[in-house]
Structures are given as structure tokens and as C-alpha cells.
Amino acid sequence: MNHYSFSSLIRAFIPLSLVIVSAAWQPAALADTRHIIVDSGDSTLSKEAARQSKEQWDSTRSLRNKVNNRVEKEFDKTEKAIDGREKCNASYNVNAYWENTTDRCLDRRTGRPVTP
């Protein structure tokens, strides 16, 4: 009876051992088929994308410079008007007055521009 159970146990372990061996063999077989592709990134599509990105950057840079120049010009104009008003109001010339619509210091009698 003991001998019969041992042989049936062996018969059960043989297929089980084959499954274990085949499972252990599988990673080695997969490792042989794997390969690594190293790409330098210089494909035609990536070059075209880089060119388009640079072109867009250059155009937005030009636009930003135009906007910044306009803002700077407006600031300088306002600053010049404020300085002119302060000089005109501090002037010793009694007939000088500041005209807000034209941002100029004018003579009360003649209406001509005065340098304070």
C-alpha cells in the first residue's frame, strides 16, 4: 500500500516538474529575443518639429518686442508730460500755464509754447 502511493506520487510530480522546468526556461527564451533600439533623435519628424518650434518662438519673440517697445514708448511719453507739467508749474514765468489736452507749457498772452 505504501509502495502504491509512492508510485502515484511520482507520477503526479513528473508533469508538475515539467511545468516548473518549462516555466524556468521561459525567461531565458524571452531574454534572447529582446533587443534595444537606440535612436539619436535626429529623425526627419523631430527636425521638422524643432524647426517649427524655433519659427514660432522667433515670431512670438518679435511680437513681444513690438509690444514691449510700444509700452515703453507710452511710458516715456507719460513721464515726459509729467516732468513738463512740473517744470511749467514751478516756472518763474507768471504767464506760463500747462495745457492738459496738448501736454505743453504755453504763454497766457500769446498761446505759444514756453520753455520753463
From Swiss-Prot:
InterPro entries: DUF1283 (IPR009700). Residues 1-31 form the signal peptide. The keyword Phosphoprotein does not apply. Keywords: Signal. Belongs to the UPF0482 family. This is UPF0482 protein PC1_2049. It comes from Pectobacterium carotovorum subsp. carotovorum (strain PC1).
